């Protein structure tokens, strides 16, 4: 067996580990699971650390398991939260589970023989257990004192903790015990905030099944500036292209700070230690070229999305930073085009105007209600100075007839000066 724990150590992915875990893994092919919250139809980059733990676990010859918390997701884990979550319907949870499964197939091999990955949903066993039965079989094994001592409970006591949330660690512990008995699972992994819940499981296994199980956690990532990893100014960075475009996804990684990127490339790629150290040496010679950031962004964008999406993100970046040609602009799909130019003025125009063959001067002044240029005089002056382009083609004459192929048969991109863009949409 490859040494899974050593792999996590050099990558900076190990926080806490129960004594005996490393030795057990070296001697036994083991099944380990990580729980995923199905309260959304997509995972976020905040889930990537634990996903990568499962990836390394599988590469070490072990069996990775993803548990979708269909039952516990109806309640919500109080760990790291200051308020109670909203409950979700079973139908919504099932839809979310399917979305999560599709995303995990990009990282884990579910059909590779003896150590194929597995996916389970804890609703499948909890739905058949009655409240009295659960109290009798599981509740009697953990004392209230034991449960109250957990950090996830302590931190919420001052602001209020419902009995439902208080029971969460018992439910998660029961998951571990169920999987220990039915699926031969011996290890649960998660973020460091899950240590209390995971060890509740090992304790329940000891008491209910007279068995020994193990726990391992990874650090909760923060960025060098102290902010939480996994979010941008606009909110969550999702793995689903419909929620976060591949362009924005790529840009998030490309914008990693120099103080963060060495950690990130160890955690989020499968590059070897030697390859990473060689890249770091090369990066140090010319940090402004951002070699580490580009390598990281390429690797993770291709894995989560596709090579085509990565190429599209590159073209989109070049368009914004002035290195592109018209062909690059025409190659963008609508999702990328709108993502790249999100926030710029989007001006709706009747398509019939094009049949009248207007001049560039008219289009950029009166026909766009003076939104691009307030007057024809100002438009004429900037065009004469070479400061206006349409679809990356410089306008040489204000009397030129508008006869440019529409992007995606709908749009014209107007650039005024170096930084001012306008998107015209013809309806």
Curated annotation (Swiss-Prot):
Keywords: Aminoacyl-tRNA synthetase, ATP-binding, Cytoplasm, Ligase, Nucleotide-binding, Protein biosynthesis, RNA-binding
Classification via InterPro entries: aa-tRNA-synth_Ic, Rossmann-like_a/b/a_fold, S4_RNA-bd_sf, SYY-like_C, Tyr-tRNA-ligase, Tyr-tRNA-ligase_bac-type, Tyr-tRNA-ligase_bac_1
Binding-site residues, ATP: 231
Entry-linked CDD domains: S4 (cd00165), TyrRS_core (cd00805)
Subunit structure, as described in the record: Homodimer.
PANTHER family: TYROSINE--TRNA LIGASE, MITOCHONDRIAL, TYROSYL-TRNA SYNTHETASE
Protein name, entry field: Tyrosine--tRNA ligase
Species this protein is from: Cytophaga hutchinsonii (strain ATCC 33406 / DSM 1761 / CIP 103989 / NBRC 15051 / NCIMB 9469 / D465)
Gene: tyrS
